[in-house]
Structures are given as structure tokens and as C-alpha cells.
Amino acid sequence: MEFQDVVRRRRMVRDYAARPVPEEVRERIIANALRAPSAGHSQGWAFLVIEDGADRERFWAAVTTPGEESPWSAGLRRAPLIVVALSHKQAYLDRYAEPDKGVTDRRESFWPVPYWDVDTGFAALLMLLTAVDAGLAACFVGIRPERTADFRAAFGVPDAYRPVGFLTIGYGAPDVPSPSLGRGRRTAEEVVHRARW
């Protein structure tokens, strides 16, 4: 698929067919995430891949409030592949303490924004685009802060890794487009400023 077609087709899909993601496609999705840019080539990310039915149930039990059901979550739960993208701040602080960077005190205030989260988001976007390129559907969703401890406990995730979000991936089923799409995309005239605000 041409890159512009991938970009145009990319949307958040919230319902999936009961069909597994082929292993070679899954591995390509992960491999492309590893190609994401990262400050200082820190690569401060990790990815938790969840495919087994029992593991997926454990995931949903950990990240949702008991008894919480909604039309969108029912469709997401059918995704045969879940990839949690986690950022690792310490990898950046350590990398930038090295001689070629020179931030030896590892101060977080050096960073104008948390690039460990930004770069993990880049990796997640590459996974979304790779899924579309392979003819799959995907959705990026966050884990609510009050559910993070349960998620960590369920999967043994170390405290040094923060879940930036997770992707549900699979073959899309007919789903109801989000009402938010009615807002339309903002135009370049609204958001692009050339040489001055």
C-alpha cells in the first residue's frame, strides 16, 4: 500500500473479527515499532504483547472497572492482539548522562517535555500504520491511572516502566464510527502558522 493511502485509511477501529493476526504480521508490527526515533537513540520503551485468550481476559480485568461494559469496550475486547507501549524514563536519564551528552546529574528538568513518552508514542504510531498497511485495524487507548497498579500486578510490570497506552489490533469488523468524526478535521489554515503566529 502506498504511504499516503496508509495515512488516509488510518482510523481508530473499535470492533474486530474473531480471526488471529498472522505471526509474521505481528512480528512486523513490533519490528517497525523498534524503528521509531528516540532522543539520543535512548530507545526507552518496552512492549507487552498479549495474544492468548486467558491473558487478554486478565488484561481487560486489570484495566477496566469491574462491571464496566460499554458498546466500545465490547468491540475492543474482541481484538486478538493487544500491545501495551511502555516508556522507560531512566533509559533517557542514563543515556544523557553519558559523555557525549553530558547531563551527568541526570536531572529531569533538562527535558522540555517527557521525551520517553513522546518517543513511545512515535513507536505506537508506527505500529498503527503498520497494522493498516497489513490490512488490519487498530485502536490506541490509554490505561486509566487508577487501573495502572492492577495492570502492573497482573503482568509483573516493573515500576520503572509507565504504560503510555495500548493498541488493540486485528481484522476490523463493521463498527459504528465515532460520533466525534462529525467534528471533521481541522484545516491547515486553523492550525498551521507560517513564520509567525
What is each residue range found by the language model?
Residues 3-13, 164-197:
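C-terminal helix-cap and adjacent tail motif
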Residues 42-120:
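Glycine/small-residue-rich phosphate/adenosyl-binding loop
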Residues 69, 73-82, 155-178:
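A glycine-rich helix N-cap at a beta->alpha junction
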Residues 33, 39-42:
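N-terminal structural module
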Residues 32-34, 83, 103-153:
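Small-aliphatic-rich amphipathic alpha-helix that forms the alpha element of a beta-alpha
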